[in-house]
Amino acid sequence: MVKDEITTTKYLIHSQINAKGFVEKPDVVGAIFGQTEGLLSDSLDLRELQKTGRIGRIKVDMTNRSGRTKGEIIIPSSLDRIETTILAASLETINRVGPCEANLRVTKIEDVRAVKRRTIVERAKELYQNMMEEFTPESSRMIDEVKESIRRPEIIEYGEDNLPAGPNTPTSDAILIVEGRSDVLNLLKYGIKNTIAVEGVNVPKTVADLTKKRTVTAFLDGDRGGDLILKELLQIGDIDYVTRAPRGLEVEYLDKDQVIYALKNKTSVDKITSHANYNHNQHRYHNKPKSHDKFESKLHEVTSSVNKTDKYSQKNESKQFKQQKNENKQVKDNSKEKTQKSTEKHNETEETHLNKYELMLKELSGTGKGRLYDMDFNLLKEVKVSDIYNEVKNSKETIKNIVFDGIITQRIVDLSKEKNIECLVAVKMSEVVKKPETIKIITK
């Protein structure tokens, strides 16, 4: 394709000609003009179109071999698409060139503007590449520096072992134990800042000490390394919950949904006896709980002791002692009956409170408001849900119960613990990781 054709035309008609004999270029050009003359309307007459410059110079490239002639014909066109295709189709009516039989076939119609666009894109790529190599984008470097300065303080070094940890680890009541620094970084991306890494299979003393003071969840990889760390934690630590990444995955590569799912489905250590039977997908252990084994052991000791005492009694007790024993039994039965009544009364009170909470929440439904109550459920104040946090934080009154038409968040729970609030009642609860045992949380 010649450069001036690209700049002066819209389309190029490419066609192939085969002639049974020896023919030359002038024969082909003459056949094109001669056999298409009068075939189409005057507006599409080739001679007229060439005079007005709407058709360019016809180019023919011929080869003669074994008494036959083959060649390629290129006709530049500045007509529109429809006129160009009609003109191209008319070329296929040519059946003779000079004295020889021939046939002509249009192979393609090339859009010169598309070629220009491709040329522009390729050249733009070259220019951009050169620019990137020659000039360092200052603004990009500035952005990276600012991001790095923000990111760097997020991870702290905690304890005498200088372990990687989230910024809230020193003050948080609940912490997450993970395997490495990358896990801490990944959880920081999703706003989880109460993490600490053990940095290997051997659990450091810093982490072992922390497990005795805080509510601890072990969030470990779903691989062999996670199994080993869990075994170590169960032996030397005092963890409360365990959760795992899906089998074969690591915490550092989990997305936000996977992290939230794992934390929601954590398993209490009380239900665990052997980490080897831990199922990564269901987050549960299949053997009997530890606490049950301990309970059975203690029960066996007590039973043995009682049996020994009974044998001794049977040998030595007199009628008077038997009478005393019957009196003691009666006292015991009376005590048991009182305890049972007390339990029933407590359950009734609990049920009454639940009904009261439901009624209060129903009254607030759709209002977007909340109510603050004291110990005896006397209304202290009614406020908008958006103002509850500030009202509770700044209040000098003794608030014990909060009922509101909204969502319980970690922020509200933390403030309630700080203010010694006993009960939170709301429509639903968001992703709350730390739930203090001193606060009763009720949702719709």
UniProtKB/Swiss-Prot annotation:
Magnesium found in the keyword field: yes
Region (Disordered): 302-354
Sequence positions that bind Mg(2+) 2: D221, D223
Residue stretches of biased makeup (Basic and acidic residues): 308-354
Gene3D superfamilies, per the entry: 3.40.1360.10
Entry keyword set: DNA replication, DNA-directed RNA polymerase, Exosome, Magnesium, Metal-binding, Nucleotidyltransferase, Primosome, Transcription, Transferase
E.C. numbers: 2.7.7.101
Residue ranges of every copy of the Toprim domain listed in the record: 173-250
Assembly and binders: Forms a ternary complex with MCM helicase and DNA. Component of the archaeal exosome complex.
Family label: Belongs to the archaeal DnaG primase family.
Name recorded for this polypeptide: DNA primase DnaG
Species the sequence originates in: Methanosphaera stadtmanae (strain ATCC 43021 / DSM 3091 / JCM 11832 / MCB-3)
Encoding gene per record: dnaG
